[in-house]
Regions:
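N-terminal subdomain of nucleotide-sugar transferases
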Residues: 1-60, 66, 389
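Conserved donor-binding/catalytic core segment of Leloir-type glycosyltransferases
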Residues: 4, 205-232, 244
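Carbohydrate-associated surface elements
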Residues: 174, 193
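Short hydrophobic beta-strand element within catalytic cores of glycosyltransferases
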Residues: 311-314
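Conserved acidic donor-binding segment of nucleotide-sugar-dependent glycosyltransferases
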Residues: 326, 330-337, 346-351
């Protein structure tokens, strides 16, 4: 089976981490026995500060590389009217098609196309699949709230795109149901893949160590990092407990978090290490991971923390309800610091020895490791491929 992945965003180079989970998933499926390739379009708007990149994109040629077992073709595309997604995709299609032909000449014709997220990949893959008679799969990772539909024509267009996919996948049950309301059709869900490198981690005994509570995110308002601080303070875990919040720090974000900690009386317990490159190492120090997001389609950070044996506390989101099962942590219906603090205090009393952490880790691996993920997507690809001959 030869699958060509078309993601809506993807690392710009082997060193880039933006969209790295698309690369990790494709590499994992290649390791599971499939031939995997990537066709990565990068849209560049013809307005705003980066308009020159948009102009250059009109003359972009496909760039072919082989990266850690993956055949990759990247192409820059001009975004003429990003809010008119159907028109935009059609305007960029001829350049995408040239990149697709370059891929086929070098690596062969795929059996199935797999688009990640509706725009731009879903729209572009729809056009490619229709022209070349290829079955395709659509996995949506976002809630699409940032992509409102402004016209009846726009709504019909995106529903037409989604309807043509052989299988439609969300990343959690609630997320799949929500996306189905907008795009129509039957949506199944497959949880995201735990990065395979985390499958081989070992857990350690924390029972004799001071308690460490942590949070890791992009630190934007949706993640509510200030609420992590307020909830930690409300938990009243004692002066020895530490709170570590990782993520990219601007001067404004750091000042806001430190002021919040001063007001909550936990300034001396707060650590802000900034951007985290070793996610596993960050999580291995934690006893409790807190994610009080407004919304999470899935929440990769939850399974990454659970894989190291940390207990989880999260607000009621689609992702939290998918990831957190009995014994993994607590889902809190409210964003009230007192209730979140009570949940943090509750899980802080759970066993922190090696056996306790190993139980939580095994709960994660049984549901999100490569074996479960690969089996589900192999079945999805087989159904999609069969639909082309039905």
């Amino acid at each position: 089976m030869h699958v060509l992945v078309i993601p809506s965003w993807y690392p710009a180079s082997p060193e880039d981490v933006h969209g790295i989970f698309f690369r990790q998933q494709a590499q994992a499926m290649a390791g599971a026995g499939l031939q995997m390739g990537v066709l990565a379009p990068q849209m560049h708007p013809l307005y705003g500060p980066a308009w020159r990149q948009g102009l250059r994109a009109r003359r972009s040629r496909p760039r072919i590389s082989q990266e850690e077992g993956l055949n990759v073709v990247r192409v820059d595309l001009p975004a003429w009217l990003p809010k008119a997604r159907w028109i935009d995709a059609r305007a960029a299609f001829s350049q995408l098609e040239r990149a697709f032909k370059a891929y086929v000449r070098r690596f062969g014709r795929p059996d199935v196309l797999h688009a990640h997220s509706l725009y731009p990949a879903g729209f572009l893959t729809y056009l490619l699949a229709a022209k070349y008679g290829l079955p395709w799969v659509l996995t949506e990772h976002r809630s699409l709230g940032h992509m409102p539909v402004r016209t009846a024509l726009g709504r019909r267009a995106e529903q037409q795109v989604a309807a043509s996919a052989a299988r439609r996948i969300g990343v959690s049950r609630g997320h799949a149901d929500f996306i189905a309301q907008r795009l129509g059709g039957q949506w199944d869900y497959v949880p995201n893949l735990l990065p395979p490198a985390l499958e081989t981690l070992t857990v350690s005994d924390h029972s004799d160590r001071p308690l460490v509570v942590g949070h890791l995110s992009v630190l934007d308002p949706v993640k509510r990092p200030e609420l992590v601080i307020e909830s930690f303070a409300a938990a009243q875990l004692g002066a020895d407990a530490r709170l570590v919040i990782g993520g990219p720090l601007t001067a404004e974000i750091e000042a806001s978090l430190r002021q919040c900690a001063r007001q909550a009386g936990v300034e001396k317990q707060l650590e802000l290490p900034g951007m985290i490159t070793d996610v596993a190492g960050f999580n291995q120090q934690l006893d409790v991971f807190v994610l009080p997001s407004i919304t999470e389609s899935f929440g990769m950070v939850l399974i990454e923390a659970l894989a190291t044996g940390a207990a989880l506390v999260a607000t009621d989101t689609w992702g939290a309800n998918t990831v957190i099962s009995d014994g993994d942590g607590v889902v809190v219906a409210s964003a009230d610091p007192a209730e979140l603090g009570a949940a943090i205090r509750q899980v802080s009393t759970w066993p922190r020895d090696k056996a306790g952490r190993e139980r939580r880790r095994e709960s994660c691996l049984s549901r999100f490791a490569l074996g479960a993920f690969a089996a589900k997507y192999k079945e999805i690809y087989a159904v999609a491929a069969a639909s082309a001959h039905a």
